[in-house]
């Protein structure tokens, strides 16, 4: 496999006529030029049993050559406090206090709080080295003085830490005290922790001005350049209530601080209260408040976890908006990324007449290429076709740069086979700091990834990408639908789930019928509202997918390119820690739609039931398929005919992830069950949501819940909803040169739904 030499991203998922979208590119070297051109994406599957990969080159103003350059990415989350006047670098005595909960105390050097220039060894820093807290000052000539704790830190234990510089005594002091309660730490009160200490060391130098910002959860690499301090030696874990004093605190002061008491308020230079700003809408901001009154406010970089339990959390309240004083922590990770913050390479203003569709900028450098996908909307407030395709951009973000098959312990067991590797997978493994993680990954300290960003290269959001289990997934899989619509001459517009979140049902009401892609798993509450209102008001929907509307997510109100998810028990790669199930971005509870009384069955008719990734089955017709009220759906399909017994995804139309009809979960009672899938292997199993007690007989050969159901129901006001309930359905549309009953059934429904008449009533 060859190395990838170039990659890029754009600033947002979608853009309308007359609007401008920006593109950012980084090559492995600052040398030569790269080529860029606009392409329309049509079919992303190179499976030889299908029509093959398709794209259309589009002449545009962006086409041309651009200087190739390497652009550095700042990886890892931290807080930055600009300090141009050196107010946080006292000339005389000073002290630093904070509460600390380290998740990787033995993982090398980690800056906890610092105003430090690592290049010149100037300033001060409170850090972890070799598992112990260290307080250091440096004079800028290479000379430093340090005091080191004589007790190592325990993992996930809250401590009160105080570092003191006392020039009068020419001394550095360090006070370390565990502040464990019944719920805030890994261990409880019964464990006799030997971790408290008070130590001192000679201070033979004076701290010189570092000429950097103050950083929480990292160290400054060098003096600030263009107003920017690069952060290195990232800290993993939580920090709560950091403070700086312009005096030398004593042991009595440190003891009071460990109890949360106020000491020497006149000498307090800064006090960053991470809970300040929590309100009824959560804490949807990167702003960090200095509660001292001195105006040293800061900003979160790369989205540390907000709404996190603090040093004094007692377990009685689980929602941070109800008890902000116990949620004063930020949880930092060395592998967070919310925006690469590269410099712009070029931009594109959408001209009038450019068709609404799936697009990408194709970039080429040396012998490698990359695609930067985006979606062109019709002119704002208009529809240019009767059909709307919703691109699953929230789910694209959830899976962005996932490494499930290659790194998850159970990845191969879930798939039923060994993973398929390609260049993008190897690149993610080698150069993770370019790309960041998905919400299916864990941070280096084991915490599940709950924030994901569009503003970074997303290597599996590429039209030719094949997922680790060997088939295509998300965007490339959704191109099966785009290709089929083009092949059959249907006129359509495209919008994204981000647009739906912004515009609601008003967006959908412009269209006679709205189509999903193959896997709209992640949705906002507002998106569910939009779908439900649209259908109830007479809209028509085609759910050509499975595992849709499963996880509730939120879009960051200040950074709409960032999405947040908080997961609970279910089909999940991780579960949020106790007390942290509520979104920082709005304070609402996260988890599954089903867990908030809104199972997918209530809107689309079917909901998640099973999954497996070895092969796909086919559908057999149920008695309702012969009901004369749905003859229009079954037209041209014989009563005994198998539906979807061939396809590009797993070899059939019923596979990978499956949804079922279930009246108990809210399937409308007038729903007709037209067909159910069969021939699923033991790799397919009932999802945890339906397992009150694990027991034998839960797999595809044994349990009735392992199936996908094709359903139809009518709604009030002439609406209708058709569901195929399988991720692999779209992969069968082009099977046998588009001459198959999956294509026929889908076309029957779509032709009916675009008519100027109500959907057939059942």
UniProtKB/Swiss-Prot annotation:
Optimum temperature is 50-55 degrees Celsius. Stable up to 50 degrees Celsius, inactivated after incubation at 60 degrees Celsius for 30 minutes. Activity decreases below 50 degrees Celsius, with 20% of activity retained at 25 degrees Celsius. One of its GO terms (molecular function) is N,N-dimethylformamidase activity. Gene3D superfamilies: 2.60.120.200. InterPro entries: ConA-like_dom_sf, DMFA2_C. Keywords: Hydrolase. Its EC number is 3.5.1.56. Optimum pH is 6.0-7.0. It holds the Pfam family DMFA2_C. Activity is slightly inhibited by Mg(2+) and Mn(2+), and slightly increased by Cu(2+). Activity is slightly inhibited by the chelating agents 8-hydroxyquinoline, ethylenediaminetetraacetate, o-phenanthroline and 2,2'-bipyridyl. It catalyses: N,N-dimethylformamide + H2O = dimethylamine + formate. It comes from the Bacteria. Heterotetramer of two DmfA1 (alpha) and two DmfA2 (beta) subunits. Hydrolyzes N,N-dimethylformamide, and to a lesser extent N,N-dimethylacetamide and N,N-diethylacetamide. Has no activity against the substituted amides N-methylformamide, N-ethylformamide, N-ethylformamide and N-methylacetamide or the unsubstituted amides formamide, nicotinamide, acetoamide, benzamide, acetamide and acrylamide. This is N,N-dimethylformamidase beta subunit. It comes from Alcaligenes sp. The lineage of its organism: Bacteria, Pseudomonadati, Pseudomonadota, Betaproteobacteria, Burkholderiales.
């Amino acid at each position: 496999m060859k190395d990838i030499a170039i990659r890029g991203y754009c600033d947002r998922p979608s853009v309308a006529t007359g609007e401008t979208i920006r593109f950012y590119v980084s090559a492995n070297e600052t040398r030569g030029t790269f080529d860029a051109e606009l392409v329309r994406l049509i079919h992303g599957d190179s499976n030889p049993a299908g029509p093959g990969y398709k794209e259309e080159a589009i002449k545009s103003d962006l086409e041309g050559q651009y200087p190739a350059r390497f652009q550095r990415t700042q990886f890892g989350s931290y807080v930055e406090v600009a300090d141009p006047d050196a107010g946080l670098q006292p000339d005389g005595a000073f002290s630093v206090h904070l509460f600390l909960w380290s998740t990787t105390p033995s993982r090398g050097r980690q800056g906890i709080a610092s105003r430090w220039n690592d290049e010149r060894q100037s300033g001060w820093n409170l850090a972890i080295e070799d598992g112990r807290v260290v307080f250091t000052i440096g004079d800028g000539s290479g000379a430093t003085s340090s005091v080191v704790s004589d007790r190592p830190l325990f993992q996930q234990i809250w401590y009160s830490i105080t570092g003191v510089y006392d020039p009068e005594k020419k001394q550095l002091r360090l006070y370390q005290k565990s502040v464990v309660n019944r719920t805030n730490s890994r261990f409880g009160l019964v464990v006799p922790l030997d971790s408290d200490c008070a130590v001192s060391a000679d201070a033979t130098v004076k701290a010189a001005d570092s000429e950097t910002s103050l950083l929480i959860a990292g160290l400054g690499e060098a003096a600030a350049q263009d107003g920017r301090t690069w952060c290195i030696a990232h800290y993993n874990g939580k920090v709560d209530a950091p403070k700086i004093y312009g005096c030398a605190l004593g042991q009595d002061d440190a003891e009071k601080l460990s109890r949360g008491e106020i000491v020497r308020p006149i000498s307090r230079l800064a006090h960053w209260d991470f809970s300040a700003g929590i309100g009824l809408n959560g804490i949807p901001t990167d702003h960090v408040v200095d509660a001292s009154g001195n105006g040293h406010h800061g900003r979160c970089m790369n989205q540390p976890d907000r709404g996190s339990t603090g040093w004094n959390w007692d377990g009685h309240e689980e929602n941070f908006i109800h008890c902000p004083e116990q949620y004063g922590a930020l949880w930092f990770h060395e592998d967070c990324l919310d925006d690469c913050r590269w410099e712009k390479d070029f931009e594109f203003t959408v001209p009038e007449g450019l068709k609404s569709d799936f697009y990408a900028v194709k970039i080429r450098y040396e012998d490698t290429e990359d695609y930067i996908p985006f979606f062109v909307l019709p002119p704002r407030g208009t529809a240019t076709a009767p059909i709307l395709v919703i691109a699953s951009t929230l789910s694209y973000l959830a899976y962005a740069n996932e490494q499930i098959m290659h790194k998850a312990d159970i990845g191969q067991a879930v798939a039923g086979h060994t993973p398929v590797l390609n260049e993008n997978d190897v690149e993610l493994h080698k150069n993770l700091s370019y790309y960041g993680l998905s919400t299916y990954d864990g941070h280096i300290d084991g915490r599940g990834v709950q924030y994901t960003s569009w503003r970074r290269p997303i290597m599996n959001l590429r039209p030719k990408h094949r997922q680790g289990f060997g088939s295509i997934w998300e965007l490339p899989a959704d191109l099966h639908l785009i290709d089929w619509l083009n092949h059959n001459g249907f006129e359509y517009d495209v919008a994204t789930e981000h647009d739906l979140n912004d515009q609601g049902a008003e967006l959908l009401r412009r269209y006679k019928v709205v189509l999903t892609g193959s896997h709209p798993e992640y949705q906002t509450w507002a998106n569910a509202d939009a779908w439900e209102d649209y259908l109830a008001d007479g809209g028509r929907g085609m759910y050509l997918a499975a595992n849709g509307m499963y996880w509730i997510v939120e879009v960051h109100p200040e950074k709409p390119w960032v999405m947040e998810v908080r997961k609970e028990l279910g089909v999940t790669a991780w579960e949020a820690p106790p007390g942290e199930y509520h979104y920082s971005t709005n304070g609402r509870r996260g988890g599954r739609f089903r867990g908030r009384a809104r199972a997918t069955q209530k809107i689309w008719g079917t909901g998640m039931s099973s999954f497996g990734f070895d092969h796909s089955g086919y559908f057999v017709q149920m008695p309702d398929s012969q009901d004369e009220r749905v003859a229009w759906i079954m037209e041209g399909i014989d009563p005994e005919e198998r539906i979807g017994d061939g396809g590009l995804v797993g070899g059939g139309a019923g596979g990978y992830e499956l949804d079922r009809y279930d009246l108990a979960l809210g399937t409308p009672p007038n729903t007709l069950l037209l067909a159910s899938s069969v021939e699923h292997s033991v790799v397919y199993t009932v999802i945890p949501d339906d397992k009150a007690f694990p027991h034998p007989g839960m797999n595809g050969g044994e349990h009735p819940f392992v199936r996908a159901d094709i359903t139809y129901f009518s709604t009030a006001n002439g609406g209708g909803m058709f569901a195929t309930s399988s991720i692999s359905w779209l992969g069968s549309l082009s099977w046998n040169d588009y001459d198959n009953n999956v294509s026929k059934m889908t076309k029957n429904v779509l032709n009916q739904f675009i008519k100027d008449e109500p959907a057939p009533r059942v």
